[in-house]
């Protein structure tokens, strides 16, 4: 049976920890979308690991891991990240990681183009990570991309990469990029990659009787190309539908869809953010929560929990359970606000829909409910009944407001065991 972990906001919700926990019983862990633009941190046996392109199921020695067809694959980052986690003690990780031959290759060329495209937008920048993700997915959609399996065919690979280089030079002129240098690097990568590249369908059929398959979402629903705050989104399908498509999942095999919700809201980069707090509360959330991006180091924008957004996310991803993270960051607030409705520019009140037009979203007025804080330390609490009454009331308010979806896990700190599991 399949469990899927998905971000419900704008990313950085803390998906890695629940994935790490669930991977202990998983025999297969898969990434379905995104690339090395994703980022999360796992603290495992007092060692901190930063994951980007690799599935975090690698922390479990019995878990096989797949980077699936919906991803974009930056080869240097793959080997760098693999070496880094093995150097920290995850021995044998290289023998447990595979990549679909249908994933697309993200080149250094794409990163150069990403920067040029962002520069061309001027004040309307999307705020990308600069990793080349958007240009790579653009090449995929335009049917000119290079797939991982083609790396093994030297002649085809080099022809297609040179064609990409020529097409981008036609568009932008001279580039700070040497295609022959990249081709030379791949001559070294080719044999190193070969043991990791698999026919995805064949690979998944070999594991179809896996009692516990875990799908690890990247980014989050509000960064989804179709359902997110377009154009301030990533370039892939980050929700439930994207996971099913990328991994050819049988929907009947899905036993749980876990939405990861930060106890407040953050986003990196540009774009609408209705509950953002450009005040002392936002500053406090940023400082106490240490809200800096794992991938870029950029400071995250912070605001109160937005339940309109969460209801919208649930309506698309159909969560069966929630993991509420970073509850402890709210410990020192006298009062905690929660967004429960939007007042649209035309005066209409909505509680579960998110407008498609970013100009409309920018003019939304958020209706808040103010709840009492608990003013006591929850870090490391491991039993629900040991939480302060007001903290439990906060959690139960969220459950009611998101249609009764149970909050089954509650994060109370950065360590792997700083998690409450409710029956």
Swiss-Prot record:
Residue sites binding substrate per the record: 294-300
A cellular-component GO term for this protein: cytoplasm
Keyword rRNA-binding in record: no
Keyword Acetylation found: no
Positions annotated to bind GTP: 11-17, 39-41, 300, 326-328, 411-413
Domain of life: Eukaryota
The reaction(s) this protein catalyses: IMP + L-aspartate + GTP = N(6)-(1,2-dicarboxyethyl)-AMP + GDP + phosphate + 2 H(+)
NCBIfam families assigned to the protein according to its UniProt record, in alphabetical order: PRK01117.1, purA
Name used for this protein in its record: Adenylosuccinate synthetase
Lineage: Eukaryota, Fungi, Dikarya, Ascomycota, Pezizomycotina
